[in-house]
Amino acid sequence: MKLNELMQAIPVFTGEASETIEISHIAQDSRKVKPGTLFICIDGELVDGHQFASRAVELGAVAIIAEKQLDVSIPVIYVRDSKRAMAMLADYFYGSPTQALKLVGITGTNGKTTVSHLVEQIVRENGEQTGLIGTMYRKIGDQILETKNTTPDSLTLQETFRDMLLSGVSTAVMEVSSHALVQGRVYGSDYDVAVFMNLSQDHLDYHHTMEEYANAKSLLFAQLGNSYHTSNPKIAVLNADDEESVRMQKATAAHVITFGIKQQADFKANNIRITSHGSTFDLRTPIGNFTLKIKMIGNFSVYNVLAAIATSFALHIPMEKAIKTVESIPGVKGRFELVHAGQEFPVIVDYAHTPDGLLNVLETIAEFAEKRVFVVVGCGGDRDKGKRPQMAKIAVDYATNPIFTSDNPRSENPRAIIEDMIQGVPYSDSYVVHENRRDAIRFAVNEAEAGDVILIAGKGHEDYQVIGDEVIDFDDRVEARIAIEKKLGLA
């Protein structure tokens, strides 16, 4: 593609977009530059891409997008916002793939991963080829690809959408993080349905205030645009029980569908019954009433199912198909996942890493726990420190046997993180501390008896632990199974 054609994606810029320069590749990482590359300088949180412009030229870049003045031997085009420009250029370069896809974006503090998997499976069961982008992986049809972020950078994102189209995908479902929205990674993506789950404290190390965090989430709904007079109107699916849904609704001109348990909603659950094996509830919808029996446990699971069914309705999938699918799904890896190895007590691994997420899971466990509740919990390093005492307080208030441990300490001292947690529970001596996460899991398993419940919280599906600059193999589910087998004399 000629540079002058590609630059049609950007309405205002400074510099000459030559009609003779051929662009075969776009990169923001100088290590990925090859002959024919348009190199985009991003001034990021850790690294300023402008510092690598000369290196990009050496590697074969033929033009550069920048915000700051550069002294290089190839054409430089200057823009106000390189991140936004990169997203728009990526969309244009890869043929605006989301205009040919049905695209669903799901945002919120908790529930994104589960809802995205539920919606993807519902659409797949309806006979469509699907794509999925989220915390655990990217999926194109049956192909699984690794992912580093919940929402990839805009270049990777648009390339993935292009690959989905080439593979016959018709509907893509993706998690949309607040970081991605603020950083402009999803600019240029044409969403058909946007879903808001909830908002509670998380990522304040980045957003600083809950107001900024909420505003970040609302960007997804502002991006839906105004489609009242089109044959395929955009739809916002909102949690009626979360007060921030008002903000999301104000941010969009799209149609709104609501779901909830407490407030009036288009998709409302009544008569919820929770057991250790699943949940049942009556569902009221715009097209009739239904009774559901799902294999997932807890009110938070009911919210996730409501969101998935409301989204399926927005995608014109038959209600019976959506209900049958969600009733057949046992859950998502690392989300209230049971570890069975012959023990007499349930061991649950869950990704709960926010105060609200931990509270939801512990409240659910309280519905069926017969005796003691053990919770193994830590907090991530180099992340929102404000939630550490809150996590500890919830663990102490809602579990009989809290065990404070390491999560992903990253560059911080694990003991210092635990000390931050303990600041939230000066009134309690019910907790114990095992800094080593493996030791904490083994302690819980060895102490537990029939009728008790163990929750291992915070890491869920993750199969690694980040300690300093080292990433080590570590999976809560594997560690729990090993501990159980040792206790039972099976290992």
Swiss-Prot record:
A molecular-function term among this protein's GO annotations: ATP binding
UniProt cross-references to SUPFAM superfamilies, sorted A to Z: MurD-like peptide ligases, catalytic domain, MurD-like peptide ligases, peptide-binding domain, MurE/MurF N-terminal domain
Known catalytic reactions: UDP-N-acetyl-alpha-D-muramoyl-L-alanyl-D-glutamate + meso-2,6-diaminopimelate + ATP = UDP-N-acetyl-alpha-D-muramoyl-L-alanyl-gamma-D-glutamyl-meso-2,6-diaminopimelate + ADP + phosphate + H(+)
EC number(s) reported in the record: 6.3.2.13
Places the protein is found: Cytoplasm
Motif Meso-diaminopimelate recognition motif positions after renumbering to this chain: 407-410
Binding, UDP-N-acetyl-alpha-D-muramoyl-L-alanyl-D-glutamate: 30, 149-151, 177, 183, 185
Annotated keywords: ATP-binding, Cell cycle, Cell division, Cell shape, Cell wall biogenesis/degradation, Cytoplasm, Ligase, Magnesium, Nucleotide-binding, Peptidoglycan synthesis
Source organism, top-level taxon: Bacteria
Enzyme class of the recorded protein, top EC level: ligase
Any one annotated GO CC term: cytoplasm
Residues reported in the UniProt entry to bind ATP: 108-114
Positions of post-translational N6-carboxylysine modification: 217
Principal cellular location given in the protein's record: cytoplasm
Processing and modification events after translation: Carboxylation is probably crucial for Mg(2+) binding and, consequently, for the gamma-phosphate positioning of ATP.
One Pfam family recorded for the sequence: Mur_ligase_M
Binding site for meso-2,6-diaminopimelate: 383, 407-410, 458, 462
Pathway: Cell wall biogenesis; peptidoglycan biosynthesis
Family per similarity comment: Belongs to the MurCDEF family. MurE subfamily.
Function: Catalyzes the addition of meso-diaminopimelic acid to the nucleotide precursor UDP-N-acetylmuramoyl-L-alanyl-D-glutamate (UMAG) in the biosynthesis of bacterial cell-wall peptidoglycan.
Identification of the protein by name: UDP-N-acetylmuramoyl-L-alanyl-D-glutamate--2,6-diaminopimelate ligase
Organism annotation: Listeria monocytogenes serotype 4b (strain F2365)
Encoding gene (name): murE
